Amino acid sequence: NLASATIDLKEYGTTNHIINNNFNKSFDDYVVALKHNLNLDNNFMPKNKNLINGKVDIIEFTLYNVVGNDIQMTKRESDGSITKQTYANKLGVMTTPNGTIIKSATIYSKIGFELRGYLKDTLYVYKDGSVDVVDK
């Protein structure tokens, strides 16, 4: 998730607010890092199947920006659809799906894949995580 933590430097320089205004770049950076970290090809298939047994699915990628006390959410679902929504007065109250309280710009992602077990059995598993983008 940290690879996708791109911020608007002009906004930060003039207002000291951390805002991520380029959702597409953040998602693209996330995809590059995911492929590299999990050793995936361009079709999200593992280059070796020792542990991950098939395609890695991006279930959700969500960017939360904080503007005053409001949270602006941009979410990409597994089918590629994008949802944008603003939640008024939710700073410090709203959480990501994995329970992280949103206090600053935050990125959440969830992936799913088939995991090869010890006796060659397989199980579809999910992994999710959140990262806060802060200046301290």
Give the residues covered by each predicted segment.
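Short, conserved structural patches
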Residues: 4-136
